[in-house]
From Swiss-Prot:
Main localization of the protein described in the UniProt heading: cytoplasm
Subcellular location: Cytoplasm
A GO CC term attached to the entry: ribonucleoprotein complex
Gene field: TMA22
Domain note: The SUI1 domain may be involved in RNA binding.
Name of the protein this chain belongs to: Translation machinery-associated protein 22
Length: 196
């Protein structure tokens, strides 16, 4: 018998696992607003237990001071977590993806894609996707800055840029800059015959 699984709108875990996400308070608020019946089923005992525990703590004067301190610590921890998430999002939005086309020998090219490690994209899977999508050789290697980059053999610059745009849109990052660099080998200027 199949059971329908409800996923949390805050942490994207199944609602039974929200406590492991570190965002339990916000998850509870979301669940109460969107699925009140499930909220009552999962957290009604917890709320009753918390109420009785706080009543017991309120009876002792040491418990009140301790509870206030714990609440302040919890509040600080939550604000730190929110600030960290905002910094990570700002870092993702401010970073850019660089797609560089380089000429090899004769009429052969490679396309090197760097800057994707910030977006939590599995580079090996992406390389495999490019290899099958463009029917070319593709690998993951370290560039001069010791960062991973995907190297695609062939002149597929436009297709790669379009695919990366769609990939970032799926992740909700369509504001990220995708910079293309086209480096072509310069031809040697022909020597002009010396004037006699």
């Amino acid at each position: 018998m199949l059971k329908e699984v409800v996923y949390c709108g805050v942490c994207t875990y199944p609602i039974d696992y929200c406590e492991f996400s570190g965002k339990l308070k916000r998850c509870k608020v979301w669940l109460k607003e969107n699925h009140a019946d499930l909220y009552d089923k999962l957290y009604s005992e917890d709320d009753a237990a918390a109420a009785s525990l706080s009543a017991k703590l309120a009876e002792s004067s040491i418990g009140e001071a301790r509870e206030e301190k714990l609440e302040k610590d919890l509040q600080k921890l939550q604000t730190k977590q929110e600030n960290k998430e905002q910094r990570e999002l700002a870092k993702k939005l401010s970073s850019k993806v660089i797609v560089k086309r380089e000429a090899r020998t004769k009429r052969k090219y490679i396309v090197a894609i760097s800057g994707l490690e910030v977006f939590e994209i599995d580079m090996k899977k992406l390389a495999k996707t490019f290899a099958s999508k463009f029917a070319t050789g593709c690998s993951v290697s370290k560039n001069a800055e010791k960062k991973e980059e995907v190297v695609v053999q062939g002149d597929v610059l436009d297709e790669v840029v379009a695919y990366i745009h769609s990939l970032l849109e799926e992740k909700g990052m369509k504001d990220v800059k995708v910079e293309t660099i086209d480096t072509k080998k310069k031809k040697k200027p022909e020597a002009t015959p010396a004037a006699k």
